[in-house]
Amino acid sequence: MAMRLERAQNILNLMSEGMLPNLVFSDEKKFDVEQCVNHQNDRVWSKDGSETVRRVSRRQNPASVMVWAAVTATGRSPLVFVPSGVKLNSERYISDILEAELLPWARQHFDGAPWTFQQDSAPSHGSKMTQSWIRAHIPSFLSKDEWPSRSPDLNPLDFSVWSILESRACTTPSNTLKDLKRKLQREWDLIPQKELRAACEGFEGRLKAVVKNKGGHVE
């Protein structure tokens, strides 16, 4: 908790000094073909008007797909579908995600303006190989020694954007993975930019909350 507090404060200091321009937040998430559970689809009204719980049925080990994406206050990357059976080790993460997707999108989106890359502390992200590659190709990034570990409450994708996408793409079960991918892609493109901006702009406030809570997590 002390390390998380220290790193949150350090990032706040860097932001106040203008050292982290145009933050780009990234993350991976697994989606499956089952219907997501939320307050709307997990409850029914009985004849007497009382609300009762209805459990959405789920199969064991449903078909799923891993996706990667990045967001910034002014835009979003392509939604990248990781091929079935592919493990995103350091080599594949660099070649299939950072080199093939992140850099081309960021160069086009920012058009020469400075930007800062964020990723979590997953093994393929924090490896020496990946950190060296990022250092050589992306001028500004939060290294594994700067980002607070185990902090999904600080990543806009984790605390907001993925939930938005799931709530809109997975309200009903998908018959196939192809159908799921189609819905995810459609809803990803339709998320209003103002919602992505709000999530990204919430990052600083959450850092301040971590500091106020002496490293505690933010709801």
Q: How would you describe each model-predicted region?
A:
Residues 2-103, 213-214:
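Extended, low-complexity cationic-aromatic segments
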Residues 5, 62-64, 90-95, 99, ...:
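Generic preference for well-ordered alpha-helical elements
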Residues 8, 27, 69, 97-98, ...:
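Mobile genetic element proteins and their domesticated derivatives, centered on retroelements
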Residues 14-18, 56-61, 85-92, 121-124, ...:
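Conserved, non-catalytic sequence blocks in retroelement Pol enzymes and Pol-derived host proteins
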Residues 18-26, 30, 157-219:
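C-terminal anion-handling pockets and recognition modules
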Residues 26-28, 111-125, 147, 152-156:
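Acidic/histidine-rich, metal-coordinating catalytic segments
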Residues 106-115, 141, 193-198:
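Surface-exposed helix-capping loop/turn segments at secondary-structure junctions
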Residues 129-145:
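Metal-dependent phosphoesterases centered on the DNase I-like endonuclease/exonuclease/phosphatase
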